[in-house]
From Swiss-Prot:
HAMAP family (alphabetical): PurL_2
Location in or out of the cell: Cytoplasm
Family that this chain belongs to: Belongs to the FGAMS family.
Binding site for Mg(2+) 2: D117, D268
Organism field: Rhodopseudomonas palustris (strain ATCC BAA-98 / CGA009)
Binding positions for substrate per the UniProt entry: S94, H95, N96, H97, R116, Q240, E312, S313, Q314, S533
Taxon lineage: Bacteria, Pseudomonadati, Pseudomonadota, Alphaproteobacteria, Hyphomicrobiales
Role noted for this protein: Part of the phosphoribosylformylglycinamidine synthase complex involved in the purines biosynthetic pathway. Catalyzes the ATP-dependent conversion of formylglycinamide ribonucleotide (FGAR) and glutamine to yield formylglycinamidine ribonucleotide (FGAM) and glutamate. The FGAM synthase complex is composed of three subunits. PurQ produces an ammonia molecule by converting glutamine to glutamate. PurL transfers the ammonia molecule to FGAR to form FGAM in an ATP-dependent manner.
Pathway the protein acts in: Purine metabolism; IMP biosynthesis via de novo pathway; 5-amino-1-(5-phospho-D-ribosyl)imidazole from N(2)-formyl-N(1)-(5-phospho-D-ribosyl)glycinamide: step 1/2
Name of the protein this chain belongs to: Phosphoribosylformylglycinamidine synthase subunit PurL
Binding site for ATP: Y52, K91, D493, G530
Subunit details: Monomer. Part of the FGAM synthase complex composed of 1 PurL, 1 PurQ and 2 PurS subunits.
EC number: 6.3.5.3
Active site: H49, H95 (proton acceptor)
Length: 736
């Protein structure tokens, strides 16, 4: 005999993340008090994580279409056509709240979830990336969180067998109580064999595949839609537990079953587990779904309908199967040692019916649960415009050489080798460019084509000016892909913000989205997938607005990709782009001058596109021997990174006479690249750039084992490398 269900009280409703007006909407919708299981289902489907109820109205303005886009937002992942019947499937998603509570398992299941999103579409994953944001290094939890998250990302990806090829890691006190773990996965599929989530046909069997259901992850989606408080550590049981080896089996079984033409629709069980996957399949197909939970494979005894519907146990799929393929599909899954159970059928009723122990535990309208969930147009206010800081009003406390050494040893600009060396970035044998450059390059099967992959955002810009910050995030991803020779094609986004019920936070989201949209249109890079993570606050203190951008580009010939390392001595160093010496919101201003203020650098998207086209053309023509975009830290940091990577020094000219020296070296003006050119090609390159009106300044020549800056002291490469490489290992070892 089953235990009596809890009485529905205001406290129980609030604990499920539902507001009083939302509960009233439920009463009006179904005409009665919901059962406990139904309350849990509404809680899961109407939270921010699943319904996007605060952001959906603004997401509609994003550009999502292009001739090469096969599938835009709304499915498990986006899909773009790269020719030769090849498609790239990719998406980025957050696992922020779980990773703060239990960093290892939170990170592992973040990676596992995004991999499932990709192979659910019929693609074999070929690469992962990530964007990690941690609190101030001096915070007592930061070192523990870094260690756990990095180990979790590496542990899952390495075991599953997909290379982690790139990413971004930052530190700021605003992430002290809410770290961000954004995971991106990229896969390859046949362009004519993409699998979607919408069910079709009445009476079709709904099949549960993969691992058994347990009580881990209970309420995970609801937790991800609420602020943290001092009792957040008590939510540890809501963090899922991942098994990469089971996921690898699930991948192979799914791809095999897809190749046998058994599948009508497929959906992974991610946030809200069985509830969300079943509702989405039915709602997208304008069908009803009836589930019999007695058939669900479980690994714990006595599980209730509520627990089974809201469990977020990992490595599970839901599939609508062609009836005549049932036996064949079951044999495939049994061969891989995975559970296969028919747990329901599609119906014509457009109702979501859940049965357990011979009783109906839920009977709800499926469309209102899914794609007709509540939609809010929350009030928002535009962020205050910050004043422009003029370079001449900023005193340089030290020389450029000393500032460079200090900057290279700061948490944000230091080498992240300690992080990415814990990831297997070459498994599969297709990684052409490893982490540490502007973008990763991955070979596509046995042909000449390659993919350029990157993740980027500058949160301090987004806080200072959300519109410009949103533009810059897309432009930076565009530059990263361009700098290796790739043609940018599309992006995925992961929008991490604070509490949307505060108008100033909602204003940040709206502003960033406007900037992202404008940049995507100007740079011809539609958004094909994404994720929104709100309520990233602890005790009322929000994170920096962090709209992570994952970019994908294609190279027709990966052997002609560029890297940032200096290649030879005696090559000319060119700066492409205009330098006005913009120090507002720069790393130099923060780390050297101790000030976080001012307007961020403006982004001229037409200039970004023009300069990107020029640099890409130089790479393809073979005239650019090394390329690096100028971003955090400015020009001198970019040159130092190129010198360290190539183990070749440089002699640099003094800044132009009219320029403030520290603004020339450390300003973060946009749309700039450092390019090296052989002496034999120099005149032709400079002549061509002058003819087409692209600013180009020769700033030095490669050579030697030091950076020699005219008017400054010489800095040995060994000293620069030590500064760059040692901060993070020393920090993680407790030495600083």
């Amino acid at each position: 005999m089953s235990a009596p269900e809890p009485k529905i009280t205001p406290e129980l409703i609030a604990s499920h993340g539902l507001k009083p007006d939302e509960y009233q909407r439920i009463l009006d919708l179904i005409g009665r008090e919901p059962t406990f299981t139904e309350l849990g289902i509404f809680s899961a489907m109407w939270n921010e994580h699943c319904s996007y109820k605060s952001s959906r109205i603004h997401l509609k303005g994003l550009p999502t279409k292009a001739p090469w886009v096969l599938q835009g937002p709304g499915e498990n992942a986006g899909v773009i056509d790269i020719g030769d019947n090849q498609a790239v499937v990719f998406k980025m998603e957050s696992h922020n709240h779980p990773s703060y509570i239990e960093p290892y398992q939170g990170a592992t299941t973040g990676v596992g979830g995004i991999l499932r999103d990709v192979f659910t579409m019929g693609a074999r994953p070929i690469a992962c990336l990530n964007a990690l944001s941690f609190g101030d290094p001096s915070h007592p939890k930061t070192r523990h969180l870094v260690s756990g998250v990095v180990a979790g990302v590496g542990g899952y990806g390495n075991s599953f067998g997909v290379p982690t090829v790139g990413g971004q890691t930052r530190f700021h006190t605003r992430y002290d109580g809410n770290i961000l773990v954004n995971a991106m996965a990229v896969g390859l599929a046949d362009a004519d064999k993409i699998f979607l989530a919408a069910a079709s046909g009445v009476g079709m069997p709904i099949v549960y595949l993969g691992s058994k259901t347990g009580r881990d992850g209970m309420g995970g989606a609801t937790m991800a839609s609420a602020e943290f408080d001092e009792g957040s550590d008590e939510k540890r049981p809501t963090v899922q537990v991942g098994d990469p080896f089971a996921e690898k089996l699930l991948l192979e079984a799914c791809l095999e079953i897809m190749a046998k033409d058994c599948v009508i629709a497929i959906q992974d069980m991610g946030a809200a587990g069985l509830t969300c996957s079943a509702v989405e399949m039915g709602a997208k197909g304008d069908l009803g779904v009836e589930l019999d939970l007695d058939a669900v494979p479980t690994r714990e005894t006595g599980m209730t309908a509520y627990e089974m519907m809201l469990s977020e146990s990992q490595e599970r799929m839901l599939m609508v199967l062609k009836p005549e393929k049932e036996k064949e599909a079951e044999e495939i899954f049994k061969k891989w040692g995975l559970d296969f159970a028919i747990v329901g059928y599609t119906t014509p009723t457009k109702r979501f019916v859940v049965k357990h122990g011979g009783q109906v535990k839920a009977d709800l309208p499926i469309k209102e649960l899914g794609d007709e969930a509540p939609l809010y147009d929350r009030p928002w206010v535009e962020s205050e415009r910050l004043p422009v800081i003029h370079a001449r009003d900023i005193n340089a406390p030290m020389g450029a050489a000393e500032a460079l050494e200090k900057l290279l040893a700061t948490p944000d600009l230091c080498s992240k080798r300690w992080v990415w060396e814990q990831y297997d970035h070459v498994i599969g044998g297709n990684t052409v460019q490893r982490p540490g450059g502007d973008a990763a390059v991955v070979r596509i099967e046995d042909g000449p084509k390659g993919l350029a992959l990157t993740v980027d955002v500058t949160p301090r810009y987004c806080e200072a000016d959300p519109f410009e910050g949103g533009k810059q995030a897309v432009a930076e991803a565009y530059r990263n892909i361009t700098a290796v020779g790739g043609k940018p094609l599309a992006i995925t986004d992961n929008l991490n913000f604070g509490n949307p019920e505060r108008p100033e936070i909602m204003g940040q989201l709206v502003g960033c989205l406007k900037g992202i949209s404008e940049a995507c249109i100007a740079l011809d890079s539609p958004i094909v997938s994404g994720n929104v993570s709100l309520y990233n606050e602890t005790s009322g203190r929000g994170i920096l607005p962090t709209p992570s951008i994952g970019g994908v580009g294609v190279l027709d010939d990966f052997t002609k990709s560029a890297t940032l390392a200096f290649k030879a001595e005696g090559e000319a160093i060119l700066l492409i782009g205009e330098t006005k010496g913009w120090l507002g919101q720069s790393v130099y201003l923060r780390e050297i001058c101790g000030r976080e203020e001012g307007a961020p650098p403006p982004v001229d998207l037409a200039v970004e596109k023009r300069h990107g086209d020029v640099v890409r053309g130089m790479i393809h023509a073979g005239t650019a021997t090394a390329v690096h975009d100028v971003s955090d830290g400015g020009l001198l940091v970019a040159i130092a990174e190129m010198a360290i990577a190539g183990n070749i020094g440089a002699s640099l000219d003094a800044p132009p006479g009219e320029t403030v020296s520290h603004a020339w070296w450390f300003g973060e003006d946009q749309a700039r690249y450092v390019v090296t050119v052989k002496e034999a090609d120099l005149l032709a390159v400079k002549t061509k750039l002058k003819t087409i009106g692209v600013p180009c300044t020769q700033i030095g020549v490669t050579g030697g084992h030091a950076l020699k800056i005219e008017g400054e002291r010489t800095v040995d490469l060994k000293a620069l490398r030590h500064a760059h490489e040692h901060w993070l290992p020393d920090y993680m070892g407790g030495k600083n």
